[in-house]
């Protein structure tokens, strides 16, 4: 157990920070130390908080490239260059978005009615981090915790714990150097379901990013929770749409980090008048349309017993085709299966965190909406859907 002492303006803080959190007792001790640190952090001024927020965001942004490389190397998923962008967004863009936001003391006052709104931290945040976006999610959650004077305990995914903890350490060290209390950011060294559940029970707020089971557990914990679960994004291409723009946008979205962004398109629903044109544009831009027998092979590869096959997550199209026993050009961008059913019994109708798309031909616009609604419902309402349409021409 390390004993840390730091001078922060008029504050003298002594925090006993356990070196690790590998079992329930150690986690409990680490949370006690964090509560002590957070009680001091809650007294900081806006000026002190903003200095810490800036230093932490700057440090995370400067480490965006090595952290991206570490995440890909550890998980075997995704694209280094795209993870660099995600880390950049989670640090510099988040800083620029919230740098002028007041989070301490009186943040709003209505003198006419005698009302003041005062910002107060909630306490300790439990942050559940996914394997798909480990470093960027850890950076983002740690930064918003610092900006709001909360402590944050991170539970990494077991397959991404090294890179997740590395990102958290960078943010913590920069924050402490800028004046934050020791132990204000922590993590579970060897995450287990037991420790994650214990963390959710002990925390004051849960930020859960992950699969449906995890998000449901967070919502059922009895604590306030904000969940980011799976999506099943449909994209409708209307017959008035700019076809090249629509196809290029979908390809860019679906190939970014090998399709691991949960808001990326999972299905394309096309109106009959432009179906052949859309198909031709996808093929022209390097996508591969699977033949009927190849569709069946890919079906069996992307889903196993109704669940997404972990072996395809974050892999490129060529690798997935190889796993399925399908021969495609090595530079293939996306594997596209033309299917009819939107039922969950159709493997292509599920969320696929990889460059594999379902493509549907709608009878008309109403049919396209019906198909899209069914896909969104199966993936979870309140997530993402997109529509490519020229509304002026439609009118």
Language-model-derived ranges and their functions:
Residues 30-32, 227-229, 257-262, 346-353, ...:
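Short, flexible turn/loop "capping" segments at secondary-structure junctions
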Residues 149, 206, 271, 320, ...:
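Residue-level signal for inorganic ion chemistry
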Residues 22-25, 29-32, 44-47, 51-55, ...:
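Conserved active-site and cofactor/substrate-binding residues in soluble primary-metabolism enzymes
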Residues 9, 14, 21-23, 139-140, ...:
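ALDH superfamily catalytic-core signature
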Residues 2-116, 144, 284:
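N-terminal Rossmann-like NAD(P)+-binding subdomain of aldehyde/semialdehyde dehydrogenases
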Residues 106-245:
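Rossmann-like NAD(P) dinucleotide-binding subdomain of oxidoreductase/dehydrogenase enzymes
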Residues 42, 326-395:
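Conserved C-terminal structural/oligomerization subdomain of aldehyde/semialdehyde dehydrogenase
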């Amino acid at each position: 157990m390390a004993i840390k002492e730091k001078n922060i303006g008029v504050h003298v803080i002594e925090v006993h920070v356990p070196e690790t959190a590998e079992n329930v007792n150690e986690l409990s001790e680490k949370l006690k130390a964090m509560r002590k640190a957070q009680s001091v952090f809650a007294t900081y001024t806006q000026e002190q908080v903003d200095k810490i927020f800036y230093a932490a965001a700057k440090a995370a942004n400067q480490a965006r490239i090595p952290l991206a490389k570490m995440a890909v190397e550890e998980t075997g998923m995704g694209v280094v260059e795209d993870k660099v962008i995600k880390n950049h967004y989670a640090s510099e863009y988040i800083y620029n978005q919230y740098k002028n936001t007041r989070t301490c003391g009186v943040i709003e006052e209505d003198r006419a009615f005698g009302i003041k709104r005062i910002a107060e931290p909630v306490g300790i945040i439990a942050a559940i981090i996914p394997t798909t976006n480990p470093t960027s999610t850890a950076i983002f959650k740690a930064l918003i915790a610092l900006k709001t004077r909360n402590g944050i305990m991170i539970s990494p995914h077991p397959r991404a714990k090294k890179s997740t903890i590395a990102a958290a350490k960078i943010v913590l060290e920069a924050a402490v150097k800028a004046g934050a209390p020791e132990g204000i950011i922590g993590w579970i060294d060897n995450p287990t379901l037991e420790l994650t559940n214990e963390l959710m029970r002990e925390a004051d707020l849960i930020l859960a990013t992950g699969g449906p089971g995890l998000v449901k557990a967070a919502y059922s914990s009895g604590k306030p929770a904000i969940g980011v679960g799976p999506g099943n994004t449909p994209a409708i291409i209307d017959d008035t749409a700019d076809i090249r723009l629509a196809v290029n946008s979908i390809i860019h979205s679906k190939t970014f980090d090998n399709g691991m962004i949960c808001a990326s398109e999972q299905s394309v629903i096309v109106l009959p008048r432009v179906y052949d044109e859309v198909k031709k544009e996808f093929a022209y831009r390097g996508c591969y349309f699977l033949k009927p027998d190849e569709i069946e092979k890919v079906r069996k590869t992307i889903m196993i017993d109704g669940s997404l096959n972990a072996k395809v997550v974050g892999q490129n199209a060529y690798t997935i085709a190889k796993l399925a026993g399908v021969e495609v050009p090595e530079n293939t961008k996306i594997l596209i299966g033309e299917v009819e059913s939107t039922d969950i019994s159709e493997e292509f109708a599920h969320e696929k965190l990889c460059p594999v798309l379902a493509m549907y031909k709608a009878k008309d616009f109403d049919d396209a909406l019906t198909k899209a609604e069914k896909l969104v419902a199966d993936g979870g309402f309140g997530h993402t859907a997109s529509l490519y349409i020229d509304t002026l021409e439609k009118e």
